Amino acid sequence: MRTAVLLVATLAACSTTVKHRDVDDAEARKLLLDRNWIEHMPQTERDHFHVYRFVPSMGGGVFQDRTIFKGTFELFQFETAADEIRFNLLETHDKVVSKFRIEEVDGPEPFDLKLTIAADPRGPQVYYGMRAETDRDGTKLEARLRK
């Protein structure tokens, strides 16, 4: 009986439901741009994390390997087509094509978007972002804060 109770408790702890919805390719290509995609929210100023930012108006993107106050960066060029990112890594001259997917998620807080880069040329493959980051008039952020 004790084993059965422990098993049920363990299964309950492991089966948290995470709400998510895959975003179609066209919307994903728009959501990819002009926002920070962060591996995880740092808990201390010395936590190590990775960040992508895809900024076509500046001619490419940046990958950061950092803490809050210190880090390194790498500039790259990119194109998107369907569900792919085509990276042109300027330092190494490597060209990498990777499938990507964006999902709407409910956390981890404060995130509501999840980016997965299948063959990530630099980082951990999974990053989180916020729709409100590019919310020009603040309505999405306001709605999120009222939850």
What are these regions (language model features)?
Residues 37-42, 62-67, 87-91, 115-117:
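Short beta-strand segments that buttress and anchor functional surface loops
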Residues 1-7:
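Sec-dependent signal peptide recognition
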Residues 5, 31, 55-57:
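A short, polar/charged loop/turn motif at coil->beta-strand junctions and beta-hairpin connectors
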Residues 43-84:
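N-terminal glycine/threonine-rich, aromatic-flanked beta-hairpin/loop signature
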Residues 20-48, 76-80:
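Tryptophan-anchored aromatic micro-motifs
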Residues 18-28, 51, 86-147:
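Beta-sheet ligand-binding and adhesion/scaffold domains
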